[in-house]
Curated annotation (Swiss-Prot):
It is found in: Nucleus. The keyword Glycosyltransferase does not apply. One of its GO terms (cellular component) is nucleus. It comes from the Eukaryota. Keywords: DNA-binding, Homeobox, Nucleus, Repeat, Transcription, Transcription regulation. One of its GO terms (biological process) is regulation of transcription by RNA polymerase II. CDD domains: homeodomain. This is Double homeobox protein 4-like protein 2. It comes from Homo sapiens. Residues 19-78, 94-153 bind DNA. May be involved in transcriptional regulation. Residues 265-274 have a biased composition (Basic and acidic residues). GO terms for molecular function: DNA-binding transcription factor activity, RNA polymerase II-specific; RNA polymerase II transcription regulatory region sequence-specific DNA binding. Residues 278-302, 319-329 have a biased composition (Low complexity).
Amino acid sequence: MALPTPSDSTLPAEARGRGRRRRLVWTPSQSEALRACFERNPYPGIATRERLAQAIGIPEPRVQIWFQNERSRQLRQHRRESRPWPGRRGPPEGRRKRTAVTGSQTALLLRAFEKDRFPGIAAREELARETGLPESRIQIWFQNRRARHPGQGGRAPAQAGGLCSAAPGGGHPAPSWVAFAHTGAWGTGLPAPHVPCAPGALPQGAFVSQAARAAPALQPSQAAPAEGVSQPAPARGDFAYAAPAPPDGALSHPQAPRWPPHPGKSREDRDPQRDGLPGPCAVAQPGPAQAGPQGQGVLAPPTSQGSPWWGWGRGPQVAGAAWEPQAGAAPPPQPAPPDASASARQGQMQGIPAPSQALQEPAPWSALPCGLLLDELLASPEFLQQAQPLLETEAPGELEASEEAASLEAPLSEEEYRALLEEL
């Protein structure tokens, strides 16, 4: 039994244009005999087909092909008219015996198949004389072989169209592995999924040009200087690139964002693994350039910039660092003793010079301790003035009692405190 094969309209032009069997023209009497037999049984057996072939003078294989084509036409017509296909009628008849092919015959057929997958009628008749098999069985053998092994055989017809077709100019159609690469935040090329294609089959617009631009990132001589060397900062703008950007349209891989460390943690308490995660963006504060975990330098912006800047690189190299005073700036005030008076704290605040313009700009977080900021807020004159009306709303008796308690418990000066300590 022949395996299902593509129709003549779907075969390549090379197979269709080769020497084919001449079309058989049926006479009216032959057509009537065939149709009468078809009405009785659409699926005649080998014995019925042989008797019909002898009666009308047509080879039995041609009678079998006629019944196959007639069943296909009737099935299409029943589907268009939404009628059920009756199927087999009567008892099933005997089928053709399976043709036994010897080893020598198979070797001859395989050699012919390797030379040509679509032999013409002349080649099939020659093989029939050499092997002793009927030509119709040889045709069925080639159909089954093409269906079971579509990639084998010689003189494979070239398929028209498609991205991975043969290269123009007579190039060999053997596939080649083309890998697209891109450059990420690490400054090195990463291979993308491989795509099998024939050489020269890719379009010259998008992927080929992009892969050519991304290829220099894979060269060792060009990738080596990118490690550990800081490039000059841009003259204008808030963006700085520590690694070459990927080409337009090149493949990319998503990377986890890199978050700055907690402002309250010191450098020793931070988790180096968590803070060292690679990421496409990094937040940095003004400061010197520091080398990344892998040795790639990331250049910080000039110290005149006070606002945080975003750069494509290894990650936050100096983000969340402790505040470092500039030249000529006073150090941050230290927290006063618990028993010091409010006037002493106000004097300390007045003695501190105003911060520079760079420090007055808003920052993501403050580097000063929270306790010191709370003391400064409570001791500020503006806060005391705003809180004075709340103190005056108390009852006169309570206000006098609080004033007497305040007069009895006056704060001790530094000399009195030292004298009290010496007496104790």
